[in-house]
Amino acid sequence: MKAKFHEYLTRFRKQKGYTQAQMAEQIGVFRSTYTNYESGNRTPDYEVLERICDVLDCSLDELFGRTPKYVTNCNVIREETTPYHVTARQEEKPRLAIGVQNFRDLREKHAYYVDKTQFIEEFLDSWYQVTLITRPRRFGKTLNMSMLAEFLDCTKDSADIFAGTKVFAGSQWQEMNRHPVVFLSFLNVKADSAGALIQALKDTVRAEYERYYTLFGDERLPEFQRKEFQMAYESLHAGSERKDSESYVIRSIMILCQTLNLYYGKKVYLLLDEYDTPFMSANSGEYYEEVRSILNGILSTSLKGNPFLEKAVLTGIQRIAKENIFSGLNNLIVCTVQEKEYDDCFGFTEKEVRELLAYCNVEFSDELKKMYDGYRFGDTEVYNPWSVSCYAARQKLESYWVNTSENSILRNALEVQGDSFKKEYETLIQEGAVEAVVDFSMAYYERMDEAALWGLLVNAGIVTIEEAIEEDYYRLKIPNLEVWKVFKELTACHLRIDERQMEKMLTALKRGNMERFAEEYQRILMELPSCHDLKDENSYHMMMLGMCAFLRRDYEVKSNRESGLGRSDICLYAKHDRYPNLILEFKYTKDEKEDLSELAGEAIRQIREKQYDAEMKGKVHYVGLAHCGKKTCVSWE
């Protein structure tokens, strides 16, 4: 049926005197999409078929050749209305396409698009030959790289998908589809073993080779180059038995650049998305030394001493320094999150968020801002684009951003860091901000000190820069409420407690269910790996304060603050009437014979006598917590 359809479609269009471009415009699709309809490579959906029938003044039966007598006379008046044909209707608004990372797919779906094509102009206007951009996961890196590839690639016809964008009216428009491009995404080059990771790397590069498969036998290429191209391609297959296979894999990207340079007579643009994923996977899988030579070699040969390279851009989470990938590159710029370059190209600005929400008939609110805003790239304040898009689609203020791969690294890092980092981390959790030395110059796994770890936390989007105090010294903050969820998991790991038990305990506390709170608190203490860290009253105080930090959405958390006639341990000021205010006072004894219930009662009396609730309005719960090792008693009123 498809074969008949595309023949009849072409015939009807020509009899009506329309060009393909005119047809595409009238039915609301890209010209390239319509061309695929007539070539038989694509079939329109039902709604598009209806629009085609309206434009060509025919029925679906006629369009599919089910009533041949009409085909030769398109001016005949229809004798009856077919059940398929409907009158023309207003075209639906573009929908959100959540998770689509291919620019062409996004545009051909007529999906809503937050225009980031200024990235193309800024990149092409740059003087640097190699650009490295570090940004968190799900901040639009892959989509932007796909967009750049579509714009530059001389094998594409991209005018339709860039129509109406910023770059369409810019100074670099004439560069569209004028250059050979090698575009590789290492997003999925990760595995549990060295062999599996190397094969994933080969598969990714081989797929780009296959895009240019017709060059294998093209006589416009010198024979030696065709042979070189073929041998590199064969080496990228699983189970290659060539003795020089590894050498060809290491040089495979450069060989592809060389081939394209000879064929098209122009130097190549190299785009490497998520370049650091295989390095991070190999390190977390503890097989890095097995793959080091290939990972280092394939990137080094592509970027250094590659005479066929016009410009390259790489994106990832962090800069890898020790492997010498970037050493010796005199024309390199590294754009971390504190740099001004490309600061508005990744993530949504508030203006873009408001426009998106208005388009979706969703109201902008302070609650949304607190949940998803708070990042700072260069001089630009940005929102998490993934979370905002999900919220616009679902209209539920939830946590959508999951950063699993980085979280595993951070959990391991918390285990090995010393007291200095732990104190800074506790300050961050308790106050929401901390001042620290930050190192952006290399990946954390290359130098596992606290400055490099803070650099990873910033680049991964777990914390953001609030203020640059001096060189390498910053005030950092947790960007928003959504990221507090990540810290809840990390803090549970840091305190060596179960996250779900912590959640149960905190829920019971804010609901005023003190019996349940006491049970969960005792359970947490009993399941701690050791009681050696619980050596005084302050130890319990700090542990509880770290957990109470995750009540910030509903409470203002204060510790050791002057109130009434003294300093309270922890005061929780309710932000909503539905929750009670809470005052927690801690007591400790080494004497196992001392009555803990009496000690907890003493804490309650202290709260009352010192009038710690003097500034609180509404319902207040007093909570006294007495401890001896892992044993506790909780009193309340």
Stretch-by-stretch model annotation:
Residues L332-I333, Y383, V388-D613, T632-E637:
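Extended alpha-helical interface modules used as scaffolds for assembling large macromolecular complexes
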Residues Y209, S252-N261, E290-E310, Y612:
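Substrate-engagement module of ASCE P-loop NTPases
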Residues F64-A88:
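Short, charged recognition helix plus adjacent turn
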Residues D45-E62:
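DNA major-groove recognition helix of helix-turn-helix/homeodomain DNA-binding modules
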Residues G17-S39, R51:
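Short alpha-helical DNA-recognition segment
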Residues A321-L329, C335-Y391, E424-I429:
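Amphipathic alpha-helical segments of the small helical/lid subdomains adjacent to P-loop NTPase cores
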